[in-house]
Amino acid sequence: MADVRKLKNYINGEWVESRADKYEDVINPATGEVLCQVPISTRAELDQAAVIAEQAFEKWSQVAVPRRARVLFSFQQLLIQHKEKLARLITLENGKNLSEARGEVQRGIENVEFAAGAPTLMMGDSLASIATDVEAANYRYPVGVVGGIAPFNFPMMVPCWMFPMAIALGNSFILKPSERTPLLMEKLVELFSEAGLPKGVFNVVYGAHDVVNGILENEIIKAVSFVGSKPVGEYVYKTGSANLKRVQALTGAKNHTIVLNDADLEDTVTNVISAAFGSAGERCMACAVVTVEEGIADEFLAALRTAAQNVKIGNGLDDGVFLGPVIREENQKRTIAYIEKGLEEGAKLTVDGRETGLSEGHFVGPTILEDVTTDMTIWKDEIFAPVLSVIRVKNLQEAVRVANQSEFANGACIFTNNAKAIRYFREKIDAGMLGVNLGVPAPMAFFPFSGWKSSFYGTLHANGKDSVDFYTHKKVVTARYSLKGYEE
């Protein structure tokens, strides 16, 4: 272990050795190899970063918006140039296959591209005449220092929801990446600095509870963006709000896919396999439950089982691999425990992913549990793994009722060619992001990532116009300019 590199925090434009007493191993989940060690930084280090970020904000917020946008454009171009390197880093520390990693990098680039439109996004509103000789204008201003807490499952895309937009709009930023996937952030920091970002505007502090609490409690930090599990998200929202911060917390999910009798069988199976088992099911837009109409159920499920059994499992860097590992051994054990809990509660295991035949790494194969009911733990809980529950239903109305019983409401999908059914689904389903004949309805950067119910805590979502509102506050100026003396 003496040769394992210890990562440093990034504060005021410099890589600074942490004062942490504890470091955690960063592991390649496909091989078990220790890639590096990440510091579990102290509260004092977070507080130091906050002071630096506040000082940087005073200057950065005064930089002309088009000039800030040019830094973002330069950053975007550098990301494009290093796309393959970034993708390989994601696969190395996260485990998802290289194709998925490339897709994630592209999504991150698109978020930076959207943020580079800051001159348009920052525009306010005005009305030339609200009364005699009186006009009003609405101006946007950055809120100040912003904190971000990011998860392991999308180490590029999710942070790129946060810091590029916040910084483009004139804020400074402190990011706590996941301690499980910190390597990618090193490269992003390097490229952002190369793009011309001034020192102190973007800071990275690795860590765990102390750093999270620092972000939530430090008075300098005015807003917090979080993506992660429901229990932590609830804590972040309650604690941050109690400290008078703006908070957006994107949390858990249990996404339902509805398959109706008229669905295109081959296309639907392909989409469900990708949505349920892509990224090892470790994404908040994964398909967790399929509700399938009785008329197509037997044929659909037979094809789905066959497709799941033919999925290639292995190291995401290897050619042809579709399903990589889950992030850690404890996640693997937790997933297997959920599968066995499903069996205890009466579900039927038709594709068993507990044994993959791989001697190293933390793998769970595609798993399908049928005859699931809404009182089962596997239906209620977010498993966050390649485990798919199946419920047979009589019709669309029943499928919607099943989905709406979940405490989560991130996304939902329907496969059908019936326009009336699509309209009914759109109007009646309780979910913020809907897909029609596609499996993962994650919106582009210019639309909000709009989970409902226990999938989101806050008012303003990530991405889209919501993100502009979240990272800015407004001043309305009402002015009287008498035209007396200019009469014709």
UniProtKB/Swiss-Prot annotation:
The active site is at residue 284. One of its GO terms (biological process) is valine catabolic process. The keyword Nuclease does not apply. Gene3D superfamilies: Aldehyde Dehydrogenase, Chain A, domain 1, Aldehyde Dehydrogenase, Chain A, domain 2. It comes from Listeria monocytogenes serotype 4b (strain F2365). Homotetramer. Keywords: NAD, Oxidoreductase. Catalyzes the oxidation of malonate semialdehyde (MSA) and methylmalonate semialdehyde (MMSA) into acetyl-CoA and propanoyl-CoA, respectively. Is involved in a myo-inositol catabolic pathway. Bicarbonate, and not CO2, is the end-product of the enzymatic reaction. This is Malonate-semialdehyde dehydrogenase. Belongs to the aldehyde dehydrogenase family. IolA subfamily. Its EC number is 1.2.1.27. It catalyses: 3-oxopropanoate + NAD(+) + CoA + H2O = hydrogencarbonate + acetyl-CoA + NADH + H(+); 2-methyl-3-oxopropanoate + NAD(+) + CoA + H2O = propanoyl-CoA + hydrogencarbonate + NADH + H(+). NCBIfam families: MMSDH. NAD(+) binds at residues 150, 152, 176, 179-180, 229, 251, 382. It is an enzyme of class 1 (oxidoreductase). GO terms for molecular function: malonate-semialdehyde dehydrogenase (acetylating) activity; methylmalonate-semialdehyde dehydrogenase (acylating, NAD) activity. Pathway: Polyol metabolism; myo-inositol degradation into acetyl-CoA; acetyl-CoA from myo-inositol: step 7/7.
